[in-house]
Amino acid sequence: MQNETKPLCGIDEAGRGPLAGALVMAGVVLKKPIDGLMDSKKLTEKRREALYTIVLENAEYHIVSFSAKEVDDLGISKCLQKGLQSIQNALDGCKYLFDGNSTFGVDNVSTMVKADDKVPEVSAASILAKVTRDREMIKMAEIYPEYGFEKHKGYGTKAHIEALMKYDRCEIHRRSFRVKGLDEPTLF
């Protein structure tokens, strides 16, 4: 029997901490090396978009998304667990490396802190997850223009908190995420 090495599937997520929008996970198996891969947060939007297309053309991949309602109903950890399982099912027979320090109870997954900046497959997954999520938030900004999603992508910026105070939550806000001043009673 030949000693075949399993391909590496890099896995990362985007949207673990925002107040609005989906949690998006991606798994990527590169067919060939791609120059310029690194943690998506260190790339410009233009460079991320260019690399997104290159990754799609040169990799096997699976992207899974959990809506704000699913995040509220299941919790972040359960969504991450289900996402890892979905990626394993879609990209079978790989070694799986997830950025971070927890496998969320999923077998046959290794973890590495900052893998999105160290391992090309995880960098590619980081790019697919972030671009997918950012594009969705830009679409949501057209439906809910008062929140400015196209700018902050649902993260808890000052402008986003101010919009929440003025307009309250919309359909894509995570109700399980508490916002100071919105969810706590005030004295006045």
UniProtKB/Swiss-Prot annotation:
It is found in: Cytoplasm. One of its GO terms (biological process) is mismatch repair. A divalent metal cation binds at residues 12-13, 99. GO terms for molecular function: manganese ion binding; RNA binding; RNA-DNA hybrid ribonuclease activity. Its main location: cytoplasm. Its EC number is 3.1.26.4. It catalyses: Endonucleolytic cleavage to 5'-phosphomonoester. The keyword Cytoplasm applies. Its cofactor is Mn(2+); Mg(2+). It comes from the Bacteria. This is Ribonuclease HII.
